[in-house]
């Protein structure tokens, strides 16, 4: 057979086996199915076609065994080709964007130049207006300076001379003598007003100087009063001794002089009240004048109240001599007035004047007026005034005043922290340390709470537990149960846990257990060793609580520490006969 004949027979297509045919059909179905599933058209996205045919390539390579290496190399070239196309496409997109940017640069430059011209024109307008305004300001200043230097001439000026002169009839205005007389009257009135301006009005600085001078004089008065009391006491003692000596000399001098003095002194004590009454009823001109001044002061105060000048009346009452109007009765007078539309509350004006002048008197404002003043200020939403009163003025605080401030803080949540700070000051001044510490806890000032507790010697464990019930904070409990400055903890951790779980505060107790659980067994052991208040039975209860609430590891740690501590026996130094190895030989 020739070569030509062999080539003729080789032209026939190869016979495909059944398995290959089924494989080709499955591949064809896979391509059609995936194309329809992805919604690819004939001109669809190349990435999705690439994924489909890459998977087909993988299936063909897995199916064919004879040409696997050739097909693998073809697939690699195919992947490299597709990757090159993608890279070129990204490069084209980036270059296209840069080209657009370069093409838009001339237009942007034109817009920027145009905007620069507009802004420069606006700046020129603003500078021009500023220079005009500055020139006007300089002109006004110059005119004001000239006006201040010149003497002001007061002269009557009538825009319409045809109108009648006020206070004169038409016939009198035409009479020269009447006009001369009226002009003399106006000149006298002008001189009187000018003199009144010099006498009745003083600069504000003069008032400040007088206030300082008044404070100095009040201090001198207090010193003089104290000295006067001491001298009166010395005079009374000398008078008793003098009377006793004269009586003892007149007597037979049989009894000792010291016993005689004591007997006369007792007689003086029994007759003391009568002496005081006689002293008050003594006809002293100075005291009569003082009573007259006080009576006039009260009448003037009532007159101001009737005229509706409540601000002046408040200042008048606050500066009353011997504090005769600084009392509850005066407060009730202002309270009865009530609110006036468009004007400040008269009662608030009274308390402002009362508290501001508290430093001018030797005794502070009493507790009742302090409480009413704080209530009045808070009812008018004037927390700023109350803050100034509490921190700056001389007041007498009470527990009720602190409670009122705390209640206001609960209503006004925005100013709650400020109210708690003010209440803490009030409670501290009153010696109510428990409430003061509670205010600090509510503010979150844990370190100040610890310092406060350390300063108090009579703060017991029950007080601490009550504090935790009022303000259950994890940070506070941790500070109370830790050593501070090498001192024992203020509170037992075990007792705190038991108290929290018994008082339906399970959430706080669980948070506390979570924090302790983070420290591991070393932290638990240190906590238990330093806790000298909690017994073994109590710690066993704590372990049971841990186990019931899902803290099994913490429960096991506590139990193991308890067992290890139970196995330890302390040997005293005096017991020298103890044989430590005795159990080995027995």
Curated annotation (Swiss-Prot):
Assigned keywords, A-Z: Coiled coil
Superkingdom of the source species: Eukaryota
Coiled-coil regions, chain positions: 174-232
Presence of keyword Coiled coil: yes
Database matches in PANTHER family: CLATHRIN HEAVY CHAIN LINKER DOMAIN-CONTAINING PROTEIN 1, CLATHRIN HEAVY CHAIN RELATED
Protein name: Clathrin heavy chain linker domain-containing protein 1
Lineage: Eukaryota, Metazoa, Chordata, Craniata, Vertebrata
């Amino acid at each position: 057979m020739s070569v030509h004949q062999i080539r003729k027979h080789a032209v026939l297509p190869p016979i495909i086996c059944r398995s290959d045919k089924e494989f080709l059909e499955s591949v064809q179905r896979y391509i059609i199915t995936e194309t329809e599933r992805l919604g690819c058209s004939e001109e669809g996205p190349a990435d999705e076609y690439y994924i489909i045919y890459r998977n087909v390539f993988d299936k063909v390579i897995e199916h064919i065994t004879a040409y696997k290496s050739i097909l693998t190399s073809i697939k690699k070239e195919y992947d490299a080709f597709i990757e090159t196309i993608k890279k070129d496409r990204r490069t084209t997109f980036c270059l296209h964007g840069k080209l657009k940017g370069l093409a838009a640069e001339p237009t942007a430059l034109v817009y920027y130049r145009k905007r620069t011209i507009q802004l420069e024109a606006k700046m020129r307008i603003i500078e021009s207006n500023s220079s005009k305004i500055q020139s006007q300001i300089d002109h006004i200043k110059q005119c004001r300076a000239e006006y201040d230097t010149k003497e002001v001439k007061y002269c009557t000026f009538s825009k319409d001379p045809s109108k009648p002169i006020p206070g004169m009839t038409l016939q009198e205005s035409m009479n020269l003598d009447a006009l001369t007389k009226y002009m003399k009257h106006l000149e006298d009135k002008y001189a009187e007003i000018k003199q009144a301006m010099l006498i009745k009005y003083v600069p504000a600085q003069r008032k400040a100087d007088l206030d300082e001078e008044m404070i100095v004089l009040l201090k001198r008065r207090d010193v003089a009063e104290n000295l006067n009391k001491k001298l009166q006491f010395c005079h009374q003692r000398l008078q008793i001794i003098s009377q006793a000596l004269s009586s003892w000399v007149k007597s037979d001098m049989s009894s000792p002089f010291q016993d005689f003095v004591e007997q006369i002194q007792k007689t003086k004590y029994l007759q003391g009240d009568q002496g005081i009454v006689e002293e008050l009823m003594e006809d002293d001109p100075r005291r009569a004048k003082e009573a007259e001044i006080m009576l006039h002061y009260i009448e003037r105060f009532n007159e101001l109240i009737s005229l509706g000048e409540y601000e002046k009346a408040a200042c008048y009452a606050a500066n009353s001599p011997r504090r005769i109007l600084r009392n509850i009765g005066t407060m009730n007078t202002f309270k009865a007035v009530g609110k006036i539309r468009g004007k400040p509350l008269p009662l608030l004006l009274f308390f402002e004047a009362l508290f501001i002048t508290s430093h001018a008197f030797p005794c502070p404002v009493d507790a009742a007026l302090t409480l009413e003043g704080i209530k009045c200020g808070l009812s008018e939403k004037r927390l700023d005034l109350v803050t100034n009163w509490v921190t700056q003025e001389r007041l007498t605080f009470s527990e009720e005043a602190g409670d009122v401030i705390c209640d206001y803080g609960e209503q006004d949540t925005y100013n709650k922290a400020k109210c708690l700070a003010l209440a803490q000051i009030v409670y501290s001044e009153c010696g109510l340390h428990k409430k003061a510490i509670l205010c600090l806890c509510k503010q979150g000032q844990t370190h100040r709470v610890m310092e406060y507790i350390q300063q108090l010697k009579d703060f017991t464990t029950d007080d601490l537990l009550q504090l935790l019930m009022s303000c259950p904070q994890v940070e506070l409990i941790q500070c109370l149960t830790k050593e501070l400055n090498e001192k024992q903890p203020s509170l037992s951790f075990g007792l705190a846990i038991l108290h929290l779980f018994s008082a339906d505060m399970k959430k706080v107790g669980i948070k506390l257990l979570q924090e302790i659980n983070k420290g591991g067994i070393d932290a638990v052991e240190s906590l238990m060793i330093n806790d000298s208040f909690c017994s073994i039975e109590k710690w066993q209860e704590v372990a049971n609580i841990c186990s019931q609430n899902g803290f099994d590891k913490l429960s096991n740690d506590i139990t193991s520490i308890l067992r290890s501590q139970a196995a330890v026996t302390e040997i005293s130094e005096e017991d020298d006969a103890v044989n430590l190895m005795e159990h080995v030989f027995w």
